[in-house]
């Protein structure tokens, strides 16, 4: 659905660097699952139905941003201060 090479470009990770490929694939799958569970609608490449959503560029960018956040922040993130 979202190709690994596109994720690597988004993250500015060299395509020849393969050490994180398995982890990035997990993040791709988790981002898609997060979208589907939040919206209660499965993502599809084509042929939408009453419930299935075609992955648009806007959805793809949102998923890439989520993957990027998870990749760069592997632990909990706190915004603001006390």
What role is predicted for each listed range?
Residues 1-82:
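Divalent metal-cofactor coordination and adjacent catalytic microenvironments
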């Amino acid at each position: 659905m979202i190709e690994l090479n596109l994720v690597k470009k988004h993250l500015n990770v060299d395509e020849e660097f393969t050490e994180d490929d398995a982890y990035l694939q997990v993040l791709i799958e988790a981002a898609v699952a997060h979208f589907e569970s939040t919206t209660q609608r499965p993502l599809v490449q084509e042929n939408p139905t009453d419930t299935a959503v075609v992955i648009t560029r806007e959805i793809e960018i949102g998923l890439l941003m989520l993957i990027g956040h998870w990749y760069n922040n592997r632990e909990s993130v706190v915004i603001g201060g006390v």
